Amino acid sequence: MMAKPKKTIPAKLSDERIVIYDKDGISRLNEKRYGELHENFLSLSFVEGLYLVSKNWISLRDKNKKLLSFEELFDVAQNIDRKLCIRYLAYKDLRNRGYTVRTGLKYGSDFRLYERSNIDEIHSRYLVKVFSEEIPCEISEITGFVRVAHSVRKELIIAIVDADGSVVYYNMGYLKL
């Protein structure tokens, strides 16, 4: 006998976030380490929302109560975040590999990454900075990210997204000779 699929979680588009008010939905998503928990709601970033819409975990409505597709959400979000496409591709790849991925904004990175086996860990081990293969990056910019990661005792992972949407990861750090 096939297991009954869980119902999609109702979500609302709210300016630059996606908001969940459904108590069961909040519990299910928070348990899987999605979003930021507030007193009576859970807020999701656009990359989290896109991922959850693509997995059919949430059904997203705008302010006019119109149901939004993945493509419609992507269009809205891309107007706010110019790096949305590459961030989403890296996020999706990391989540599909079983990692817990959280915002890295506080550290000037795209994401904080938690080990797969340590989901309840308080501190992330890695910071992830996402780049497009098609846009040149100055080495001084990468050096700055390495310095920040080192100063907060984290390892820096550079995620490079190519034209096909594939992601390659590089671990960056200091080498003392």
UniProtKB/Swiss-Prot annotation:
Catalytic residue list: 114, 123, 154
Record's subunit section: Homotetramer; although the tetramer contains four active sites, only two participate in the cleavage. Therefore, it should be considered as a dimer of dimers.
Enzyme class: lyase
Protein name: tRNA-splicing endonuclease
Lineage of source species: Archaea, Methanobacteriati, Methanobacteriota, Methanomada group, Methanococci
Domain of life: Archaea
EC number: 4.6.1.16
PANTHER family assigned: TRNA-SPLICING ENDONUCLEASE SUBUNIT SEN2
Family in the record: Belongs to the tRNA-intron endonuclease family. Archaeal short subfamily.
Function: Endonuclease that removes tRNA introns. Cleaves pre-tRNA at the 5'- and 3'-splice sites to release the intron. The products are an intron and two tRNA half-molecules bearing 2',3' cyclic phosphate and 5'-OH termini. Recognizes a pseudosymmetric substrate in which 2 bulged loops of 3 bases are separated by a stem of 4 bp.
InterPro entries referenced in this protein's UniProt entry, alphabetically: tRNA_endonuc-like_dom_sf, tRNA_intron_Endo_cat-like_sf, tRNA_intron_Endonuc_cat-like, tRNA_intron_Endonuc_N, tRNA_intron_Endonuc_N_sf, tRNA_splic, tRNA_splic_arch_short
Catalyzed reaction equations: pretRNA = a 3'-half-tRNA molecule with a 5'-OH end + a 5'-half-tRNA molecule with a 2',3'-cyclic phosphate end + an intron with a 2',3'-cyclic phosphate and a 5'-hydroxyl terminus
Any one GO molecular function term: tRNA-intron endonuclease activity
The species this protein was found in: Methanococcus maripaludis (strain DSM 14266 / JCM 13030 / NBRC 101832 / S2 / LL)
Gene giving rise to this polypeptide: endA
A GO cellular-component term linked to this record: cytoplasm
